[in-house]
Design a protein with these regions (language model features):
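Core of compact, soluble alpha-helical bundle domains
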Residues: 1-119
Length: 119
């Protein structure tokens, strides 16, 4: 039986480690840091972990706001989206995630483009 992306990322624990690292990178990223200043980072990490777990095929239920609502009024640029994805790639590589899984996550994140850019 083929493992789900959720399982291949290390289930909830592995995904939480990826998200924790990625959000820390966002907060330190010169381009993204202003977006994270003053935010409740532990809450952002929790919600992003649930979202990513569900999106990767895990049993968790994300009951937060949809991506368009979360990003409404932020006027996020494509450059910021790419920087966000780059931070996730670096976090996954740091966690030892394989190239196939990294590519799958990148495709999922990029598929959200219409929900987060310039909304």
């Amino acid at each position: 039986m083929t493992q789900s992306l959720y399982q291949r990322l290390g289930s909830a624990e592995g995904i939480a480690a990826i998200v924790d690292d990625a959000v820390d990178r966002h907060a330190a990223n010169q381009l993204l840091a202003p977006r994270f200043s003053g935010r409740d980072l532990p809450r952002a990490k929790q919600m992003a972990t649930l979202f990513m777990c569900m999106g990767a095929g895990g049993p968790q239920k994300y009951d937060g706001r949809d991506m368009r609502t979360v990003h409404a009024g932020m006027n996020i640029s494509e450059q910021e989206l790419i920087a966000t994805i780059d931070d996730f790639v670096a976090a996954m590589q740091e966690q030892g995630v394989g190239a196939t899984e990294v590519n799958e996550v990148v495709a999922i994140l990029y598929s959200l483009k219409g929900e987060v850019l310039r909304v």
